[in-house]
Amino acid sequence: MVASEKSKILIIGGTGYIGKYLVETSAKSGHPTFVLIRESTLKNPQKSKLIDTFKSYGVTLLFGDISNQESLLKAIKQVDVVISTVGGQQFADQVNIINAIKEAGNIKRFLPSEFGFDVDHAHAIEPAASLFALKVKIRRMIEAEGIPYTYVICNWFADFFLPNLGHLDAKTPPRDKVVIFGDGNPKAIYVKEEDIATYTIEAVDDPRTLNKTLHMRPPANILSFNEVVSLWEEKIGKTLEKIYLSEEDILEIVKEGPLPLRTNLAICHSVFVNGDSANFEVQPPTGVEATELYPKVKYTTVDEFYNKFV
């Protein structure tokens, strides 16, 4: 596709964790790329630096807010595709995006803020269950309104989970002992953030992903917790002491711990105890798999990912 034929993409939540990767990939792929930002974001030193980077890619900044219907509608009328990457506190506010898309009438595809695990297959405990339920509610609303969509299921963000194996306070993989959630046997899936962005932007104009759930399941990256630890042990030539956190232990911490830890552990319970990331088949016609659709994309394997930490 030449640039003039590529869809115009609006990213809402573009300065967030996964949003910034999508903005960069969209712009560098030749899509006219727009980012909705609050004017107050410019006053944040870290975010303003990121916004300068966006400008260097040729991104158009549109000032507005997900809670301001007028600014939302104005932004949406300028594009073909809307991608939302808003965080959990704003999942419910995506109703405003749905209403604006409905009113504008010009959107060819909406990608709501998914970018995690398939909430239609997950069996999460609180506080993750409420977050997943909000995503489910948004899905059903999109479908009921007849808005063209793609749901992006990328599973674990590799850069978020693999460097610390779920221990949020660590910056590098362990070299002495490791805590493993559950028995470590259920398979999970890990995808590098840059690859998530590449597959997502590939999908926006692809008729094969229209009204479908796009699952990212790179074959080399479907690994159990035990397999990830073994791979790391091979890299460093050392056997780690393994502490297995039982389901009972996890449930106890989820009850008593601080909220960010509770949410993270509840998601870990869903993935590593229930196996919700990979315990189901991608079912056509509603489900499609990214590495099968885009075999030319060279994804980063978990094995390659760990090389930089050795």
From Swiss-Prot:
Entry binding sites for NADP(+): G13, G14, T15, G16, Y17, I18, G19, R38, K47, R139
InterPro entries: NAD(P)-bd_dom_sf, NmrA-like, NmrA-type/Isoflavone_red_sf, PCBER-like
Pathway(s) annotated for this protein in UniProt: Alkaloid biosynthesis; nicotine biosynthesis
Record carries keyword Oxidoreductase: yes
Disulphide bridges: none
Keywords: Alkaloid metabolism, Cytoplasm, NADP, Oxidoreductase
Broad EC category: oxidoreductase
Superkingdom of origin organism: Eukaryota
Induction of the gene: Stimulated by jasmonic acid (MeJa). Induced by wounding.
Deletion phenotype: Reduces capacity to produce anabasine and nicotine associated with barely detectable levels of pyridine alkaloids in leaf tissues.
Active site, per annotation: K135 (proton acceptor)
GO BP, sorted A to Z: alkaloid biosynthetic process; nicotine biosynthetic process; response to jasmonic acid; response to wounding
Pfam family, one: NmrA
MF (Gene Ontology): NADPH binding; oxidoreductase activity
Statement: the UniProt record of this protein carries the keyword Electron transport: no
One GO cellular component, as annotated: cytoplasm
Family: Belongs to the NmrA-type oxidoreductase family. Isoflavone reductase subfamily.
Subunit comment: Monomer.
Name of the molecule in the record: Isoflavone reductase homolog A622
